[in-house]
Amino acid sequence: MGNSLRCISQEQDPNQKKPSSVVNGNSSEKHVRRLSLIPSFRRRTLLPSLSCSGSSTSSTSKKGGIKTKKKIRERHHQEQHHHDHEKDSLIQDQTLAATNILFSQTPRNSNSAPPFRRSTSVVYTQPPTAAVAASVGSVSGALTPKKSTYGYVRSSSNRQRSSTDPVLKPNQLLDKELKVEGAETKRFVLVHGGGFGAWCWYKTITLLEKHGFQVDAVDLTGSGVSSFDTNNITSLAQYVKPLLHFFDTLKPTEKVILVGHDFGGACMSYAMEMYPSKIAKAIFISAAMLANAQSTLDLFNQQPDSNYDLMEQVHLFLYANGKKNPPTAVDFDRSLLRDFFFNQSPPKDVALASVSMRPIPFAPVVEKLHVSEKNYGSIRRFYIKTMEDDYAVPVSLQDAMIKSNPPEQVFHLKGSDHAPFFSRPQSLNRILVEISQLPPKKSS
């Protein structure tokens, strides 16, 4: 296009008088028509070169062309800057509008949290409204805990909370600092139940350590990370040996708060008889609290027949020495663990237990425990009752133990299954801290 314009300029005689627009209107129209073929976005850059080609020997024309180019660049820069400014303003307006929409959906005159939840443990603290249920549609069934074939509530992360449930609401600060003052000792020792291991206390350990306690969780022989074969355990003393070794390593004047769950109650009772001076308090959590000359098997034979069918199917006897001899261990049917032990626990904890639980040695279960009032009876005992959702150690059995061997004080933990360290870790932690702060009894 630029070459054609230069050809037009060269054909004209430089000595020829410039015709007026009236006389040579056709020539002017032809020249204008040629210029109109140039796209509008290229005219600004071509016109200065056109004027330069017409008077290439004139320095004034050259200076004028340079100034024109400079003005064009400045004008282009100003237009680009104005365009960027308008674009930034538009983005700011859109951001402000989105923010207004967000805050308009959040109640301003309430203490409730925004509708963003990291935890999925409890989404609906109350039954959902009809509008919410309609919006959920096909997944509305997830709001109601499922039931197993035995009629027991399966583990569900959105179980509706009871009005008497002591656990904090999701929009409250669950890690709010507890004041720990006046504790006789700030060291806890946790003893797991039958089939469990130190791994089951991971939530409790975290919460207690956050409040300044020193916490030790023991793996009993053949449990947790112990490589010992449970079929070869022949006595209660052999089973609790790691716990006894722990007490042997304590300083002479050091005391601990001993906590046991399930069959761990019998194990801690054995240690209480041997190390009474090193135990400040003993806490039984839905645990076997045996009387003198009583075995854990004797205790569980008192269990009502209501859960007998499920209990019989959950427990699988192992006969390492042949079926003509007594069982050597008791294993679990993994498909029934949720119904029996963890019907209120989060699914992730149920999965952890299903791959971590190990058989219970049978010999310690049938061994009768011998305790004395002088040693075992001198230690302050506390019992934490799990309520109606505990099918492994029902409330009736816990009440029978409490009646026959009364502790100093009983605490109730509602809404928990047999594993409160999974289903109600915050509530369990508060009770443990509360017991730790109870002042020591004055000697008479």
Swiss-Prot record:
SUPFAM superfamilies: alpha/beta-Hydrolases. It is found in: Plastid, Chloroplast. The active site is at D262, D390, H418. Pfam families: Abhydrolase_6. Residues 1-58 form a transit peptide. The gene is MES15. The keyword Metal-binding does not apply. Gene3D superfamilies: alpha/beta hydrolase. Residues 1-27 have a biased composition (Polar residues). Putative methylesterase. One of its GO terms (molecular function) is hydrolase activity. Residues 188-312 form the AB hydrolase-1 domain. It is an enzyme of class 3 (hydrolase). It comes from Arabidopsis thaliana. Its EC number is 3.1.1.-. This is Putative methylesterase 15, chloroplastic. Keywords: Chloroplast, Hydrolase, Plastid, Transit peptide. Residues 1-36, 48-91 are annotated as: Disordered. Residues 53-63 have a biased composition (Low complexity). Residues 64-80 have a biased composition (Basic residues). Residues 81-90 have a biased composition (Basic and acidic residues). Belongs to the AB hydrolase superfamily. Methylesterase family.
